[in-house]
UniProtKB/Swiss-Prot annotation:
Catalytic activity line of the entry: uridine(38/39/40) in tRNA = pseudouridine(38/39/40) in tRNA
Record GO biological process: tRNA pseudouridine synthesis
Single GO MF annotation: tRNA pseudouridine(38-40) synthase activity
Pfam assignment, any one: PseudoU_synth_1
Enzyme Commission code(s) on record: 5.4.99.12
Active site: D50 (nucleophile)
Similarity field: Belongs to the tRNA pseudouridine synthase TruA family.
Function field: Formation of pseudouridine at positions 38, 39 and 40 in the anticodon stem and loop of transfer RNAs.
Keywords associated with the record: Isomerase, tRNA processing
Protein name per Swiss-Prot or TrEMBL: tRNA pseudouridine synthase A
């Protein structure tokens, strides 16, 4: 077995699905076309993400015939917004120590201190039944453990870093939805306590997937990295960043000159 560290830009959902292009399907096709794939199946992954959610440090475990050459694989993926950044041969599936998600929230004049106070209440082990979407295909306990939530800000956006053992469907996006209401003064900080009360039921907005990135699914693996692939990956995101800065400038100009 091999573990592959992968990144992607959110244009596809992650999990294999019939008659749909997904991160897993596209990756498996690339591994097959380059002659590395032994079995067309993802054995295990670090996290399943929805369409719109990006990833920097997700991983998949797959059966390969031989040691992969990442530059060959990434050449097949270059127009898909998917990259294999590292790999390691393994004998058993590694345990994920934690998952780190980051949400980028436009800075609209939030009460950041209130957001930080609300976030503190979510740290620890709680029932996140109000802060997740039920997956009807699986009966899962809503009890989850959040290790840390950190809030930072600049002129344009807030960064919400959430680190936990595991997450329920839409849990991070609903946590951000709750913090948004607190930060805009629509709900008091104490409202978070009600959301975490296992006997209380209340709907919470789910924020868009485009603001979310899986920073890392942490495992005790020393990946073998390919410098060329890393360089091309950084070049892509460098160009992406420049384009977004231009778009921000255009948007500000439109708002400035529109009466």
């Amino acid at each position: 077995m091999y573990i592959l560290k992968i990144a992607y830009d959110g244009r596809y959902s992650f999990q294999q699905q019939p008659h749909k292009q997904t991160v897993c399907d596209i990756l498996l096709d690339a591994l097959e076309e380059t002659g590395f794939l032994a079995k067309k199946k993802v054995i295990y992954s670090g996290g399943r993400t929805d369409k719109g959610v990006s990833a920097l440090g997700n991983f998949v475990v797959v059966e390969l015939k031989k040691e992969p050459i990442l530059s060959y694989i990434n050449a097949k993926l270059k127009d898909k917004g998917i990259w294999v950044l590292g790999y390691r041969e393994i004998d058993e599936i590694p345990k994920v120590k934690y998952r780190h998600y980051r949400y980028i929230l436009p800075n609209i004049g939030y009460d950041v201190d209130a957001i930080k106070e609300g976030a503190k209440k979510m740290i620890g082990t709680h029932s996140f039944h109000n802060l997740s979407k039920r997956d009807r295909t699986k009966e899962k306990s809503p009890i989850r453990t959040i290790y840390d939530i950190k809030i930072s800000e600049n002129e344009f956006y807030l960064t919400v870093d959430i680190i936990g053992e595991s997450f329920l469907w839409n849990m991070v996006r609903k946590i951000v939805g709750a913090l948004d209401l607190v930060g805009r003064g629509k709900k008091p900080v104490e409202w978070i306590d009600k959301l975490l009360d296992e006997n209380h039921r209340e709907g919470v907005p789910t924020f868009p997937p485009e603001g979310l990135i899986l920073v890392e699914a942490k495992v005790d693996i020393e990946y073998i990295y390919d410098n060329y692939s890393i360089r091309k990956f950084k070049e892509y995101w460098g160009e992406f960043f420049k384009l977004q800065v231009m778009k921000i400038g255009i948007a500000k100009t439109v708002l400035e000159f529109t009466k």
